[in-house]
A protein has these predicted regions:
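All-alpha RGS (Regulator of G-protein Signaling) helical domain and cognate RGS-like helical scaffolds
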Residues: 1-115
Length: 115
């Protein structure tokens, strides 16, 4: 449980920083989704083992790292670009740690995937 609360703090801080950045630009952030809504958007496969859970978590972290990297390319505001680059770097580290835990090369390629 400690690992989940630790990870949740990261995600909460990321969401808070993004919300604050949007509000500083006089925008309005979308409402936070519940865990049930997220599960519906990213349904987990059958999680029958610890390996299944780690692989699913790794796929989510990879997806987050890729999404944040794509946001950097789309944004014009330097502060927002920096924010998404910093968050994406953390997500990539999470992905690498999960891959390493699975016995896979932590960094499988010279570049973060584009998809």
């Amino acid at each position: 449980m400690c690992g989940m609360s630790y990870r949740q703090r990261f995600e909460d801080r990321h969401a808070q920083a993004i919300t604050e950045a949007i509000e500083q630009l006089r925008g309005r952030a979308s409402a936070a989704k519940t865990w049930t809504e997220y599960a519906a958007m990213y349904p987990p496969p059958k999680l029958a083992s610890e390996t299944d859970v780690l692989q699913y978590a790794a796929s989510l972290e990879r997806g987050a790292a890729v999404a944040d990297t794509k946001m950097v390319a789309k944004l014009h505001d330097p502060a927002l670009r920096t924010l998404f680059a910093r968050i994406g770097g953390v997500e990539a580290m999470h992905w690498a740690l999960l891959r390493s835990t699975l016995g896979e090369p932590p960094i499988p390629d010279s570049f973060l995937p584009a998809d």
